[in-house]
From Swiss-Prot:
One of its GO terms (biological process) is cellular response to oxidative stress. It comes from Verminephrobacter eiseniae (strain EF01-2). Keywords: Iron. GO terms for cellular component: cytosol. This is Probable Fe(2+)-trafficking protein.
Amino acid sequence: MARTVQCIKLGKEAEGLDFPPYPGELGQRIWANVSKQAWAGWLKHQTMLVNENRLNLADARARQYLARQMENHFFGSGADAAAGYVPPSA
């Protein structure tokens, strides 16, 4: 049986992650409070942030920026919107 969590992002009980997705205390908080579905949403948003802001992940400042955005996305006021991103019209 899959592990379930009360997902902080979705506001409902959902299937939890199999392991902490990030090292340290932040990774443990995410593992305990974030569902697989919400994590997949973050990965899509993170990809947009990297692409639209042309982040170089070899740069420690870019990685620190993404870590702050990840924490804000799940536990704060929300992550930054991807600069220049225009959602497709329906």
